[in-house]
């Protein structure tokens, strides 16, 4: 064990206080070496402080620059906001005011313009006012007409699309109820009654001409999908300086619009006039796709030359768009291109239609090919039974012993190609009436209805199916029969040996209605009653029924022309009729044009 002294010595050995005197000496010795180190430390501190000051200065400069940039951007944003504010105040607010004025003020003004238009029309028909052809501009361009600016258009296709877009709202109202059935339903067990009414044409160009002393001859009308077209010869009471003829050929086209009480209104939107001596004595008509097309000739019979020896006569082609001042308005003479077998064609009052930018008409054609087949058909039919046509030695319209065939005239209206009239032919039922062959659109794809009107009270007329495609065929449908004595494709029209009704002075053309089910209409000028009347006959071959309705006339006379064109409007039958007659009292010729409506109803229906 350690002694007390050892413990004390150990304590002082390990304890600082045991060597305090030595430590004090060492400390004093080290204190003499402090100044160099302190200077070095102070130098480092000074450098650090200067670096911090430099960094602080740089950061301060950056912050100042950022503040200046932020102030500049803020100022720009405030300027833009101020500009937007002024834009709203100076531009949008007046624009909203203009829109409000258009809606609140222009609409009543538009109604007032329509009112003024009606008043102007009333004044226009004032007999005391001298007629001026140029005054018709306001009549066919009323304030409600859609204006289209064609200045910047060079492409005809673009123009057609613009016109179609502008016309669609008008056509949509006309399509409603345009394909419905006009007859009472099958469940009708009671009597079927018909109610008819006559309406004048108010804003049609031809109606304004008839109201004057001017005379209209041979009017043709075609109606298709809410658009109508007309062509006629006008004999005015005076002649303007630009015409050196006594007759003027007029073409007009327009919309069928809804008017008061939803009745159809024929409103002219475009027209064209030509002197008769410009090969416009005889003209056809076709309407469709917002366009009118017509073929005009001096003489009805056209001789076709297929070599360079003969001088081929041209055919005048007239096209008219629904609106004026467009490339669709054309007058051009074309040389027809025909099959070598076609020797002649005969153009009279023909109604066609336009589909897929192709205008199509049907006409009688004289063909040298396969004449023996047609003659053998007639000879075999006449071997055992004598039909009235068996004794004929001359056939309309060309005369002589050659039977006419069916000719088809097609006129492509594609703006990318030049106008060209193509003539093709085919055979079908024997043709007994050489004047007036009409072509109506059919719901069936690639075909149409070809009609030939009755004649002299002995020929009932006929209706055939005619193809529109490359394979041109004519197939009998109604008013024809196949003789038992003949074989093959041999059909004859129905013909009587004597006039069936001597009270019928004239008959109209046959009209096929644009309905889903096959219906057709014909009208006659009848004098069997105390008052003369135009009697309508409406046929439904599927149900083997027909309806009649007479429209009594306030005048009496001898008619020389009767033409109708019918359409369906809100499930009622509407017909445009034009007829000329010589009055018994004054021996003067009078032309009448109007619209008639026939409404069929059932008195009692099955539950």
UniProtKB/Swiss-Prot annotation:
GO terms for cellular component: host cell plasma membrane; membrane; viral envelope; virion membrane. Keywords: Glycoprotein, Hemagglutinin, Host cell membrane, Host membrane, Host-virus interaction, Membrane, Signal-anchor, Transmembrane, Transmembrane helix, Viral attachment to host cell, Viral envelope protein, Virion, Virus entry into host cell. It is found in: Virion membrane; Host cell membrane. GO terms for molecular function: host cell surface receptor binding. It is a single-pass type II membrane protein. The keyword Transmembrane applies. Residues 1-37 are intravirion. Glycans are attached at residues 149, 309, 391, 422, 456, 587. GO terms for biological process: symbiont entry into host cell; virion attachment to host cell. SUPFAM superfamilies: Sialidases. The chain crosses the membrane at residues 38-58. InterPro entries: Hemagglutn/HN, Sialidase_sf. Binds canine SLAMF1 at the cell surface. Attaches the virus to cell receptors and thereby initiating infection. Binding of H protein to the receptor induces a conformational change that allows the F protein to trigger virion/cell membranes fusion. The cellular receptor might be SLAM, and may explain the lymphotropism of the virus. This is Hemagglutinin glycoprotein. It comes from Canine distemper virus (strain A92-6) (CDV).
